[in-house]
Amino acid sequence: MIIGLGVDIIEIARIKKVYNKFPWKFVNKLFSDREQKKLMTLHNPNEYISGRFAAKEAVAKAFGTGIGQVRWKDIEILTADEGYPVVNLHGEALNKAEELGVTKVYLSISHSKTSAVANAILWSD
């Protein structure tokens, strides 16, 4: 059963501007150590950062809270060996998921040259 649905779209140029101005402050605020490790392997990180930003926003919106009641790092987006995004919840996001009975978070991330979009579904068995 679907518990929540969230979607977010972001302009890659907007993320690129902030990242170029405050690279490590921005990255440390948004990403876990494992997410940062993946970021370090990329030649052009703007799509990755934008997609993950949109994904975290989409998951937070699916909870009905948005970012603010959960921290950016409470929502960790990794990549499965098969290439699809995997959501790991921590802290307040995990507490909220347990409170709502969430058993799985489905996530889709896509990019164009100018935008990144993400859609998140909170699922309960």
From Swiss-Prot:
Listed SUPFAM superfamilies: 4'-phosphopantetheinyl transferase
Molecular function terms, GO-annotated: holo-[acyl-carrier-protein] synthase activity; magnesium ion binding
Origin superkingdom: Bacteria
One GO BP: fatty acid biosynthetic process
Keywords assigned: Cytoplasm, Fatty acid biosynthesis, Fatty acid metabolism, Lipid biosynthesis, Lipid metabolism, Magnesium, Metal-binding, Transferase
Reaction(s) the record says it catalyses: apo-[ACP] + CoA = holo-[ACP] + adenosine 3',5'-bisphosphate + H(+)
UniProt cofactor(s): Mg(2+)
Protein EC: 2.7.8.7
Major subcellular location class: cytoplasm
Record function comment: Transfers the 4'-phosphopantetheine moiety from coenzyme A to a Ser of acyl-carrier-protein.
UniProt family annotation: Belongs to the P-Pant transferase superfamily. AcpS family.
Protein name (database record): Holo-[acyl-carrier-protein] synthase
